[in-house]
Regions:
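Conserved small/polar residues in nucleotide/adenosyl-binding loops
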Residues: 141-147
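Active-site loop/lid in soluble adenylation, ligation, and acyl-transfer enzymes
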Residues: 3-16, 20-135
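Acidic, proline/serine/threonine- and glycine-rich low-complexity intrinsically disordered segments
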Residues: 137-139
Length: 151
């Protein structure tokens, strides 16, 4: 069996995920766990992915021996899990990345002190697919080197 057959044998057939995979491969793109694939999605593809994922999450719950039929806490949990993964936990995968903006900060007319920024970080471990939450603190100051170059 060739390596290409083994690599492609896992792919679902006739699904929205398969259509997206074909677009990515045609573009010679990559779709690893940490990659942003938003440029390959049509407007309603996220909703279609949720619909495709829902019965799969229901199957996981069934395999975990959770009574989805009678447990009111588990009613529609497959859909909620699918929505959570697409719209929240992995939203950076399916939405365009934001543009970063740089602002000038010249010593003569700018802020001269230490800038400290605390940013909340929400991510997903690409190995275990579990949420990772934290805070990153970044501090920097404007600096003029002896050569009059600004840093």
């Amino acid at each position: 069996m060739s390596e290409d057959i083994l690599k492609d044998s896992w792919e679902p057939k006739g699904t929205i995920s398969q259509e997206i995979i074909k677009k990515i491969k045609a573009d010679k793109g990559r779709f690893w766990a940490g990659d942003n694939i938003s440029k390959y999605l049509e407007e309603d593809d996220k909703q279609k992915l949720i619909e495709e994922l829902t019965p799969k999450f229901e199957a996981v719950l069934d395999s975990l021996v959770i009574d989805r039929a009678n447990d009111p806490n588990s009613n529609d949990t497959g859909r909620r899990l699918a929505k959570m993964y697409i719209n929240e936990l992995m939203s950076g995968r399916y939405n365009p990345m934001p543009n970063a903006t740089a602002f000038p900060n010249h010593v003569e007319d700018g802020y001269k002190g230490m800038l400290v920024v605390r940013s909340e970080i929400k991510s997903l471990c690409s190995h275990h697919h579990q949420p990772v939450n934290g805070v990153a603190s970044v501090s920097y100051t404007h600096l003029t080197l002896p050569t009059n170059r600004e840093v």
